[in-house]
Structures are given as structure tokens and as C-alpha cells.
Amino acid sequence: MYKFRIQGSDKPLSGEVTISGAKNAALPILFASLLAEEPVEVANVPKLRDVDTTMELLKRLGAEVSRNGSVHIDASGVNDFCAPYDLVKTMRASIWALGPLVARFGKGQVSLPGGCAIGARPVDLHIHGLEQLGATIKLEEGYVKAEVDGRLKGAHIVMDKVSVGATITVMCAATLAEGTTVLENAAREPEIVDTANFLNAIGAKVSGMGTDTITIEGVERLGGGYHEVVADRIETGTFLVAAAVSGGKIVCKNTKAHLLEAVLAKLEEAGADVQTGDDWISLDMTGRELKAVNIRTAPHPAFPTDMQAQFTLLNMMAKGSGIITETIFENRFMHIPELQRMGAHAEIEGNTAICGDTDGLSGAQVMATDLRASASLVIAGCIAKGETIVDRIYHIDRGYDKIEDKLTALGANIERVHSDDL
């Protein structure tokens, strides 16, 4: 078991960081490669635990998968249609295997998935969407089993609620359906747009992505192609917050400002000088006062829930107090008690947290509870006085590519150590 050992400092986190490809686009794209009858190449795929698990799952299903810079996938030889518990128990994204399997092969089964413990994220919306396309779904022995006689059939589907995961499932499955599918109340996240762009690159006919109505004209087969994964807007935002709370100056390269406009607006409101270019974003907090801001998470293009923990920390370190309202997931304030162990000030009332006016943080032993919460704890350790030990960092490895190396390049004193060495 590995942990992060961080020696805190009042030194600003400053410099340049290259942003990786987006995990939340890479995973559905890798699963969508199951739709392709010819080889595909996916570039800018981040090196993450969930990506490794997905590649292993694709191999288990019979695909040929290799990584040499880009990820190369040949799914022409897929001969197994079950995503087993031992592979998917740690990763909720595994449900994305179901749509491509039933769409291309007429059958598929996926063990009910695991992942971050941040509240209920049921697969009901995925199941209902596939049923509307004509699939028969059964829940047996911990598995979601889907079958269809012949091809799926295009349908007019209105999502009961906005869901990124279910939008991806239906969109991918509908590419090989007979007829046209219209998906209303669809999620609008950039990662959905990127997944649709990949599907079109291999021969699909998807339009309207990025709006709340996506149209998919079914085709008989999908071939091969090349796609480069979009930049990770959450990693971008995380490093911008790290610079902001430490009074630093940073340039995030290989990223796009339009991916996180709501986050940039809140950083400017907090007092940061934010500049943008075609493929970079800079933030300068030098000599500026950090001000608390009010945040309300909501589906894209509003403020993303995956940046809530980082802005909770920002508010804790800012002048004044800010109100954080979490509307996407319940139970997503688990990082706050850990930050309070370091001396942070916050009050939680239901889905609202009031944070601010913390007079410095002190190093402590803290425990990561989910992916984004762990990022806020790591940043807190960088700016705290004394030593911080962050436990359960396997959470952070699910979503951040070499975070300790990137923070070290910005001036942080952080190392990955085995529990036996502490």
C-alpha cells in the first residue's frame, strides 16, 4: 500500500504543467472501440489505473490491445461477451462495455460495477435506454445481462434525468441500431462530444453532441480510425486551484479554455488573473488576495461536481466565507472532515458546506475517500505547515497521471512511499 508524504511549504506552486488526456473521455472511447470491426488508434490516453483495467478487460474479451505512445485496439477477434467481477469491481465505467457488446454481437453481460464511494450512481438509466433500443435486460447473480434478437432498433428516447454515463451508453449502442435514434435531455459534457467525435471517426453518424438533443443515424458496421482524446478539464482545474491557493503562477499546456469556462469564471471571481490561448491557460495569483466564492454544482456547462472538492479547499483558504452547494451526488463532502483535521474551517448542512477564513493548515495524517477529494487533500498538504501523509492514494491514481511528478515540477515536496517505509 502506497501513500503520499508531503512536506508543506509557504512557497508558491509555480511553473508549467502539461495536461493529460481526459480520463472521462478516454474510458468510454476505449469501450466504444468494441464497436469497430477494424483496428483503431487512440492517442493522448492518460496513464491511469482505470485505463489499465479497461485495456485488460478488452483483452479478456478477445481484443488485441497494445500501447506504444497511442493505444492500439483490434476488436475484430472479440469472442467473449462477459465483463467479469474480478476486473470491474473497482471501476464503475465498466458498464460502458454493455452497449457496444449488445449492439455489435447481440449479447453482453457486465458485473454490477464499483468505483468511488460518493453516493448512488445506479445503472437504471443505462438499462432503460438499452431496453428502449430493443434489448432484453436481466439482472442475475450480480450481472447485468443484455440480449437482442437481430439488431437494436432506433428509438425516440427522453432521458428521465441528465446522465453522462447513460448518454454515452445509449449513444454508442445506437450507432449500430437499425434506423435513427433521437436522444433528448442528453448530457452535454465535453467528454460526450469527444466520444461522439471518435464514433464518427470510425464511421458512425452522430450529430447534435454538446446539445441536449443527440441524433444517431444507425449504420450496419463500423470500421477503424484514429482519434486524439480531448484534454482533461478536471486535471486542468485542479492545477489552476493549486496555484491559486498557494499564491503561485502557472501555465497549463495542452488544454482548452472552452472546456472549463465555469471554473475559469470562478477563479477570476476569486481574485486570480486568468489568461488563455489556443492550447494553454495561465493563472497568476502573485500578490493577489484570494476571495471566497459561492459554488453550485450542476451538469455541464455549469460548474462541474468534479471540481467541488478543490474549490472547497480554495474557499477554506480565502478571505471571507463561501457556500458550496452539491446538487449532483450525495455524500460528496467526505473530504471536509479530513481537511478539518488539518485545521480547516467548515460547516456542513445537508448538501451545503460553508467554508472560509482558515488561519493556515497544519500537516496531518489524512485519508483519501474518492478521486477528487484526494486531490484536494494533496494540494492541502502542499500548502500546510509540516508533514502530511495521504493514505489510500489508489483513489488519486484512478484519475491523475503522475500527479506527484507534476506537483514536484511546480515546487512541491511530495513523494510516493510504501507504508512499510513510514
Curated annotation (Swiss-Prot):
Taxonomic lineage: Bacteria, Pseudomonadati, Pseudomonadota, Gammaproteobacteria, Vibrionales
Positions bound to phosphoenolpyruvate: K23, N24
Organism: Aliivibrio fischeri (strain MJ11)
Summary of the function given for this chain in its UniProt record: Cell wall formation. Adds enolpyruvyl to UDP-N-acetylglucosamine.
PANTHER family reported for this sequence: UDP-N-ACETYLGLUCOSAMINE 1-CARBOXYVINYLTRANSFERASE
Name of the top EC class for this enzyme: transferase
Official protein name in the record: UDP-N-acetylglucosamine 1-carboxyvinyltransferase
Transferase found in the keyword field: yes
Subcellular localization, as worded in the UniProt entry: Cytoplasm
Source species, domain of life: Bacteria
Pfam families, per database record: EPSP_synthase
Predominant localisation class: cytoplasm
Assigned EC number: 2.5.1.7
2-(S-cysteinyl)pyruvic acid O-phosphothioketal modification, residue list: C116
Biological or metabolic pathway of the protein: Cell wall biogenesis; peptidoglycan biosynthesis
Gene that this sequence comes from: murA
Keyword terms: Cell cycle, Cell division, Cell shape, Cell wall biogenesis/degradation, Cytoplasm, Peptidoglycan synthesis, Pyruvate, Transferase
Keyword Transport: no
